[in-house]
Structures are given as structure tokens and as C-alpha cells.
Amino acid sequence: MSEISIGDNSQFGESVKIYDHNHQYRNLNLLINQQGYVKGKVIIGSNCWIGSNVVILKDVVIGDNVVIGAGCVIFKSIPSNSIVYNNQNLTVTKYKV
């Protein structure tokens, strides 16, 4: 729909999704699939590692030499030479028998 560009030597884990568009939703009287799309470029630099299950949304530039950890949702641009990861707290609870 718009443009997706991937630099040299960039690698992707399983199930990475890249979206260069999104649905418009401005008119409550129309179904969402009748309202068209908003488009935007996605540019991924060279020598990047994009982990499994990462989602990259429109209007994003990922610089060179970037590592993105598994499961991240990238909704804003990432400068070169950066590491991005999800810092979620993992809660483990034991069953009471």
C-alpha cells in the first residue's frame, strides 16, 4: 500500500508483522471497512535483528544496527545503535492444593 524498505543484512525472527497502513475510523455511521486506510512508510535500516513476534506499525524508521527483542510493538522511530526490549513483569503464582 505504501512503502516498506529493509536494509542489507537485517534479519527477522518468526512471525514478525510489518504494517504500512491502518484503517481510518472517523464516521460512526459507516462500517470501518468502508472508510479507507491511512498509509505510512516503514524503513528498517541495515544490520538489524528483529526478534520473534515483533509488530512494526506505519510511519516508523528503524535505524542501522538495531536489536528489537521478541514481542515488542514498535509504534515510534528507533535511532541507530539501539536495543529495544519489552520490560514486562512476569508474575508466577503457585497452585494451592
Where are the regions that the model predicts?
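Flexible, glycine/small-residue-enriched loop-and-beta-strand segment within the central core
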Residues: M1-V60, N87-V97
